[in-house]
């Protein structure tokens, strides 16, 4: 199997999440095609891993890729926030957790679910087919204000009102059914000088729809807390984000973990014990090198943040 996706910040992840013992367990909570996991299992021969993904089709590709590692890798099909929340009691606590929040290139190129605005694929965007709403459901049913708010809040699209207005106008004649149809509508909705920028004018709207369909920003705070709670003492948690909405949430959560007191400001006496839960290992987000960006342009948006869970067992 030839992988479609190129994993970002690979060397940086391997260094920041280096095992500190031979029996360490690595959990890739966003397995995708398995690029990060393959690199960890190759670099660290004593490491065992669990790969989690909500998309059965891409997990099958990962299973094929990681077959040479045999029993060193186990797989779980489902959302990673739910996996960590219901972490099996008979599993050892993970020492290393990596969460790459980006969408795999597989979904744009091979999934057939309308993630790419240049395709005639059905406008779906669900990572898991059991989800209730597809992108087409949202585009064809939301009123103009709600649609504009969604595009602005999840896509940070400055022309969200114009785009929503054009969508509502066009769907009155015929419902949207494929991705290219929607992309062409967005292209016509925005000012001419916006049509030929660094990114396609539909990029941010498609991002917003994908986030809404899969509940990505709603899941993220739950995912962070659930993953950190099962992490072994001295374990490391790494997050790769690709847009500012995600990165702000991760940055704030890690900052809270590093605080020596988490009591409300109006509380006169500290009740939390006055000890930080984690050490932030990346004072600033780690970015891709110029060389990586040259070889893999999508990596230009990637940001890696890592924390270490402080071990108070012997203090």
Curated annotation (Swiss-Prot):
It catalyses: cytidine(1402) in 16S rRNA + S-adenosyl-L-methionine = N(4)-methylcytidine(1402) in 16S rRNA + S-adenosyl-L-homocysteine + H(+). GO terms for biological process: rRNA base methylation. S-adenosyl-L-methionine binds at residues 34-36, 53, 100, 107. It comes from the Bacteria. It is found in: Cytoplasm. One of its GO terms (cellular component) is cytoplasm. Keywords: Cytoplasm, Methyltransferase, rRNA processing, S-adenosyl-L-methionine, Transferase. The keyword S-adenosyl-L-methionine applies. It is an enzyme of class 2 (transferase). Pfam families: Methyltransf_5 (PF01795). Its main location: cytoplasm. Its EC number is 2.1.1.199. One of its GO terms (molecular function) is rRNA (cytosine-N4-)-methyltransferase activity. Belongs to the methyltransferase superfamily. RsmH family. Specifically methylates the N4 position of cytidine in position 1402 (C1402) of 16S rRNA. This is Ribosomal RNA small subunit methyltransferase H. It comes from Treponema denticola (strain ATCC 35405 / DSM 14222 / CIP 103919 / JCM 8153 / KCTC 15104). The gene is rsmH.
